[in-house]
Amino acid sequence: MSMKDLKISQLIVKHYFQKLNDVLNVDVAIAGCGPSALALATELAKNGRKVAIFEAKNEPGGGIWGGGMMFNELVLESELEWYLKEHHIKYKKEDEFIVVDAVHFASAMLYNATKNGAYIFNNVFVEDLVMYNERISGVVINWMPTIKEKLHVDPITVVAKFTVDGTGHPANLVRLLSKRGIINSVKGSSENLCSCGVVEYEFPMDAENGEKFVVENTKEIYPGLYVMGMAAVSVGGGPRMGPIFGGMIMSGLRAAELIEEELKRIETSEDKMWVRV
């Protein structure tokens, strides 16, 4: 009797379990695996941070793959040429813009994130948040098929020093707080929310201003919870920008910068419970 089939199953179960067990306590948990998440994860993982991305779909990469209207090319501003060179991504220059093959770009982003040590879990949905002492401290996860089929199966918890909403247009994590009235508590930031406590929706297309807006609105929206990418646009009520991805990359890099600063602050602080002082 051949043991090859058994060994294949054993190896998959063993190594997936090891991987999942390793991320139950992380520095950063990210919901959604779009370009901002990949840029953020790559930077923090390079710094030795433990980063886990949870993507509900089977194919991580967010909106990169389809380019513009399924023309699988995408555009970045020429200011991002350094980033493409640093990550060995092929591109073509056209005036003040850069054109990149969408499939190549998505593949390269995924490769660089995982090569540097970030974990990516596809088919895993972030259904809720962990909160300790009025601070977001991780995510609650379940299999996406469980959610789609509405099966009565309890989720499990991943504890994180910082959590990031990278769910794109829906801004799922922020809305989890908004619908409970938590986002407007005394410790929450409400400057870019409606007075009624409902999160704004993104405005119509305006690529130039949308690219600026997404970076400016990448921030900590509630203690322990950051927004970036299209989630930051939706939360702030900014304009969408379509198949230009410079703002997405810069948003992820901005989030990485902000979170790295906070992680260093925690390391030098006597505050061991990750609660802001």
UniProtKB/Swiss-Prot annotation:
Q: Which cofactor does it need?
A: Fe(2+)
Q: Does the keyword Iron apply?
A: yes
Specify whether Membrane is a keyword of the entry: no
Enzyme Commission numbers on file = 2.4.2.59
Q: Which reaction does it catalyse?
A: hydrogen sulfide + glycine + NAD(+) = ADP-5-ethyl-4-methylthiazole-2-carboxylate + nicotinamide + 3 H2O + H(+)
The highest taxon in the source lineage is Bacteria
What is this enzyme's class at the first EC digit? transferase
Which amino acids does the record list as binding glycine? R240
Q: Where does Fe cation bind?
A: D154, H169
Binding residues for NAD(+):
S36, G63, V126, H152, V153, D154, M230
GO BP term, pick one:
thiazole biosynthetic process
What is the stated purpose of this protein?
A: Involved in the biosynthesis of the thiazole moiety of thiamine. Catalyzes the conversion of NAD and glycine to adenosine diphosphate 5-(2-hydroxyethyl)-4-methylthiazole-2-carboxylate (ADT), an adenylated thiazole intermediate, using free sulfide as a source of sulfur.
Family note: Belongs to the THI4 family.
Share what the entry says about its subunit structure, partners included. Answer: Homooctamer; tetramer of dimers.
Q: What is this protein called?
A: Thiamine thiazole synthase
Q: Which lineage ranks, top first, belong to the organism behind this chain?
A: Bacteria, Thermotogati, Thermotogota, Thermotogae, Thermotogales
Q: Its encoding gene is what? A: thi4
